[in-house]
Amino acid sequence: VRVKSQRTTLTSILSLQKEGEEVIREGSAQDVSKKDFRRIVRLRGLMAETQLTDHRFHSKDLEAFVTRALTAVGLPASEAEQVAHLMILADLRGSDGHGIFRLPQYVRRIKASGMNVRPNIHIVQETEAAALVDGDNGMGHLVVGFSAKVAIEKAGRAGIGWVGVRRSNHAGPAALYAMMPLARDMIGIYMAVGSANHMPPWGGIELLLSTNPIAFAIPALEEPPIVLDIATSVAAYGKVKTKAQRGEGMPIGWMIDAFGRPLTDPKRAEEGFLLPIGDYKGYGLALVFGLLAGTLNGAAFGRDVIDFNKDDTTSTNTGQVIVALDIARFSPVEAFKRNVDEVIREMRNSQRMHGVERIRVPGERSHATWLERSNIGIPMNDTLFKDLQRLAADLGVDGLPS
């Protein structure tokens, strides 16, 4: 199914709670013509209209499908819709390893009682500026969504809201949650303990660390926000899994085996481990983020981390942190955003190295992907499409349009 290009609005709003509170806004509310859309795509070195893909779906069709599937395994409809929106927002932004790709895995865990479909997500203890949230083994998207709301409310009162999370689950891309405070003119920060250990300590071979991601979201006035979303490994493990599904090889530098030899076949990933960014520096960051998101909150870290790719039944006790900073406590909001615009343009317009077409800032590529896929739909390889159709048949729900 190919979705025709059309005018679209540069606004993406997620309602976290049932009352429909706006907690995320991406870009500025302005129409983008087809001409402008093509200009943006060219800046990415790609004409989306000619990009080859097996299937392409409108985001609303995918959201509806995910909602049907999650409702079929016991999630209340309103909560299934929240999870579906976040999962497909991941796909819209190009995080293909964290979107609908994960649905079969989530369904398996729910059916095996590895996740709680009726969790009592609650605050364990709190102060004016901090809180600890217990997710009761609920879906990570719901747990972190709840926690982001708490952080935003606390930042509104105290200037900062730091919320630690325990007994959560895999929640998708870090950027989704770091961006939630943007709608309140706040800066967002998110950290997490990954849902499986794929890295050893620097110089070791025992898998004691995950890809422990961090994300920052900083609003701008006219430019899209700065959104830095990075794993502490060179590549997130979700990218390895999507490479394997597509039958593609991995670049040298993503993984090595126990003897230090490059590993490029994603189907042999179990024979090696991911490499950290910046060598020992990435190892140090993964360790610190794990202590802040895991150990500090009473969540799993190190040997206690459950590999949710292999174990569908055991509670993962995943730990996360969401932080909101109220810009107005430090600087006039509009002046700050204008200064961010200036910094973005200074970076983008600086002198380029020979052969470099464009200097980008963090989040620019994901924002362009969001524009592209909002216009022409989300691509899907045939293997994933068939997996999802089989899942629909197993659950007794309508599948994707073919």
Q: Which residues does each PLM region occupy?
A:
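Intrinsic disorder/low-complexity segments
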Residues: 1-46
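Catalytic-core signal marking the mid-to-C-terminal active-site face
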Residues: 48-62, 301-402
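Active-site cofactor/substrate anionic-group-binding motifs, chiefly glycine-
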Residues: 98-152
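Phosphate/diphosphate-binding glycine-rich loops and adjacent basic-rich segments that engage nucleotide
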Residues: 198-267
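Small-residue-enriched flexible segments
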Residues: 237-301, 310, 315
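A generic, well-ordered mixed alpha/beta core segment in the N-terminal half of proteins
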Residues: 128-221
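Acidic, glycine/proline-rich low-complexity segments that act as flexible tails and inter-domain linkers
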Residues: 48-59, 64-83, 88-89, 96-114, ...
